Amino acid sequence: MDVVVKPNLLFIFTDQQRLDTIECYGNDQIETPALNALADESFVFEHAYVSQPVCSPSRATMLCGLYPHTARVPACNVSLPQDVKTIAELVTNDYRCGYIGKWHLGDEIFPQHGFTEWIGTEDSYRQFFSSSEQHQHLSDYHHFLVAQ
């Protein structure tokens, strides 16, 4: 019986990341060995464009495959509506989906939109999305820093 090995899907979203700031895209001034290693074992987009130059709409587009106005996230500090599905909600159940980092599409503290593994890093955005009783919860990153 052949075992089908599914590929890992890893998306890395960075802020203020221009094409000319990564070594694998030809920059010879900035060393990015970890990103170069990922590029060597994967693929590099050579003709990619963002749908919007600000964080939340761009993230919504990449996670949902929809234009910002269709995903109903036309600006920052707009929560991704529950009826808009992300890639984590569209892949089969045998994938474990995790999100680590800055979400900017809703509450930063609690798992949502199909992601079951969740490490939030932005406490300041709770004010935009959390109910007041949830403001007592702090991000995993906050707890990590306190433990240091």
Q: Which ranges hold each PLM region?
A:
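Formylglycine-dependent sulfatase
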Residues: 1-148
